[in-house]
């Protein structure tokens, strides 16, 4: 699918089948994150792959709305090395979610509200921080993939030169 179609049709999914995400797809998703631009090309994003149900449960306990991680066969924590910022993590996350969707794999970003807890559960070095975790999997139903989500008209969002 072309980039514009991928962007327009991607929806967050919170219900997944138990079908595992193939290793080839995982590598493609991770490569998409790696290829994201970063401030001053610092490339601060690191990734922790979570497939084990118990590990996902322990990490999910660090977020307030992290249940999508429990249902997904795969989750990837985006970790920031020193000097990395949310801007860098966001660019990597969007690349990863779009690369997944191109393969029919849905996703849902999850915030880790207790970052110290998440860092402990993931065994991070003291100077690294969890930016977010993304749940990945095949959608439980076709309906969840194709629902129409209304968007604010572009004319209401865009201003030229000044507000």
Identify the meaning behind each predicted range:
Residues 1-163:
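Acidic, surface-exposed loops and disordered segments
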